[in-house]
Design a protein with these regions (language model features):
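Acidic, Ser/Thr- and proline-rich intrinsically disordered linker/docking segments
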Residues: 115-266
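Short functional micro-motifs and their immediate structural scaffolds
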Residues: 18-19, 39, 280, 295
């Protein structure tokens, strides 16, 4: 136990590391305070050397200047938000209310290499309690489905290549109860209320519930509520939110790349309509001799 309680020194800042504050590196130790300054999207700390961590912390310190200059022109998402600075061609992803202090990574639109919406589906078997209180399965088996919505942004960055975050705070499942009081018990939502007409409960802050007129879950010979959940307003809200984020990032990435291609295209000599000189227009599309607008 001697080495366990042996005092360790942070290879980054030189400070003493407390008993539960050590964060292992490939060739040294790092205190929790230094580790907390790393990018939240970085996951290879244990495989990183002391020098690599120092380089990243320098990058993170420089990032604070980008955060200070960031001006939000568009906000996408709820808890975890994608903030766009469309004037400067940059974005960040953060859940912090005071993001200026949180120092989220500021990335350029051109850093985006891909973006997709991932919808994870899970299912839980619906069971009932028999006369002895034991769990029993229905025949055929019945299942309640739930869904979680994730955005995955692929990026060019020296310290991480993926930003993945969840859109919904809790799983979208129409609040189905998965353990019934008996084989003939009425389907209920969690909390005890009977489910009638398939209209799901409205969560706090949600604009509505399931599709009006949907069939009650497990009615007749049905063994799944997947269709009802996927047609609920909550499901559609997060699906639309994910598509909006995905489309926005792919659109600005395409715009930046088209501009880069246009800027790199060979310049064509034109005759200036004002001075008659043969000129190659400058970046503003003006004659290099008289300054007249040659392009448009």
């Amino acid at each position: 136990f001697g080495k366990l309680f042996e005092k360790k020194e942070c290879a980054i800042c030189g400070g003493e590391i407390g008993l539960l504050g050590n964060r292992k590196l490939e060739d040294g130790n790092c205190c929790k305070n230094c580790a907390a300054k790393l990018s939240p999207w970085f996951s290879d700390r244990r495989q990183s050397t002391v020098e690599e961590i120092k380089e990243q912390l320098a990058y993170r310190e420089a990032n604070q200047e980008k955060v200070a200059a960031f001006r939000v022109t568009r906000t996408l998402g709820e808890g975890m938000k994608v903030l766009l600075d469309e004037d400067d061609g940059r974005f960040m992803v953060t859940s912090a209310r005071n993001w200026q202090e949180a120092n989220p990574d500021v990335l350029s639109f051109s850093d985006v290499t891909g973006c997709k919406l991932d919808i994870d589906e899970s299912k839980t078997e619906i069971q009932y309690k028999d006369a002895e209180g034991k769990r029993q399965s229905f025949s055929p088996r019945r299942y309640a489905f739930s869904y979680d919505f994730y955005i995955v942004i692929n990026v060019n960055n020296p310290y991480f290549n993926e930003i993945r975050f969840k859109l919904n705070g809790s799983s979208v499942d129409n609040d189905e109860e998965t353990l019934l009081d008996g084989p003939n018990a009425q389907p209920c939502v969690r909390g005890g209320g009977l489910r009638t007409g398939g209209a799901g409960p409205i969560r706090p802050g949600m604009p509505g519930g399931s599709r009006p007129g949907a069939r009650p879950f497990m009615g007749g010979s049905r063994t799944s509520n997947a269709d009802e959940v996927r047609s609920s307003m909550e499901y559609r809200q997060y699906e639309e939110m994910g598509r909006e984020i995905r489309d926005a990032l792919l659109q600005v990435r395409e715009q930046v790349r088209n501009e880069a291609v246009a800027a790199a295209a060979p310049k064509t000599a034109l005759t200036c309509p004002f001075c008659g000189a043969t000129t190659t227009p400058d970046a503003s599309g003006c004659c290099e001799f008289c300054g007249g607008a040659v392009n448009g």
